[in-house]
Amino acid sequence: MATASAVTAWGKPTIKSGASGESGAIGTTLEDVGKIKENTTSLELVKGNVNELFGEGHELVDKMELEGTWTLKFTVIKASLDKIAKFFGLSVSTDKLAMKTTIVSEPRSYTVDPLLVGAIGAELPYCYTSITPKFATAEGWTIEFEVTTMEPESESVAPATLYVKKAAAQASSQSTGK
């Protein structure tokens, strides 16, 4: 059942990520990505290619828009070597990280969970992830993420699912009247 009106999804979402599940389904083990820099999170639909067929005199004869993709962008602050290594699938050795790759090779799942109950969140089950570790004297080490949905292997899995955040279940002692 849809809600009549949505709660505004003000800042401070919780973003979790992990390996994608079987056939492109949402992963079963997702972990918090860490502290997110203020006002860096965005999730938007990027429209697909538009094909247009014109006749003489620039008369539009036919038009077709292809499916788009969702793009999630955010920046993780206070990044540690362990955090950087984890996203690249590398290991830290004696307080050093040999950056043998700058590519996230495996598809990942993401959830964007809003702070407020009743606000809209998103599940992105099968994504390409581009990350950029960055150092600036004003912020220290950060990790910039750009996540793009891909078509899951299974046709029964949607590239993105929007949901309304529900209240957490009350403690069992409250529900039993104790």
Predicted regions and their residues:
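Short, cationic low-complexity segments
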Residues: 92-111, 165-178
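Beta-strand elements of well-folded, non-transmembrane domains
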Residues: 76-80, 114-118, 149-153
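Beta-strand secondary-structure signal
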Residues: 71-75, 109-111, 144-148
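Solvent-exposed edge beta-strands and adjacent loop segments
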Residues: 2-84, 124-142
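Mixed-charge, glycine-accented linear interaction segment located at domain edges/termini
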Residues: 119-178
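Acidic-leaning, charged glycine-interspersed low-complexity segments
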Residues: 97-133
